[in-house]
């Protein structure tokens, strides 16, 4: 799937500079006035009028730029993105429904723009009738707004030659296969599709309920290829601990620096929380080495966290202490 962030800026979006527009207005004015106007002073009322015209032109072109970007999937936001997604037959999911009767009233919590944008792009995969990985991922993500990530895998088998005496006891035309890769499934069979699902961190829906919801959606006759058997499981946490000593430069408040380092680390861990996610030791160092930190002595983890398609990184404890450089 194309990474939208790597696309060049669209030519329809114009680069705007006030001075360029002002010089254009000034050129048009001079072409009409000829030598009859020479009072080119900043304080001249005519100059002020031309500056206003150039500014208004700048605003109009900026509005055109915004409208052009709102029509593109890579840049659209909010209601513009919802309308763009509707062109693909995709609707924004509701995470928490509104409760107007509550005191105070509770607004609905909706799917975020980036999640909707991602599903919209995946929706093209759903047009495949061959059961592509992208199609399974799209249908799984669309089954519940509680999900943030889905991985798709399948077991692999190879044929085995058997002795003639054994073959004679098998049904006519039977073949014998062995499983070379189980894709995390118990007793895998040809045609199995292994899916792992990961819920958002604040989800209150039981994992078993999410698994059942996804399995029901993927088993629909208009979704599942007749030769496939989807099998869904919850993501498996790959637990790790973070323990580090942060050496704070003389001057800054150690508590303030510690809070900044903790926030940076939390962000890095949250970004790695996905199936098949990774959190290298270098990423932990980078997250902790914020402004005001002179050195980081990392005790744990000793090795980076590397997950397979059914695992995701999960920090079970974080211990950060500070020492001031003297």
Positions of predicted regions on the chain:
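N-terminal polar alpha-helical/low-complexity "assembly arms" that mediate subunit docking
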Residues: 1-130, 135-139, 255-326
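Carbohydrate-recognition loop of C-type lectin domains
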Residues: 125-275
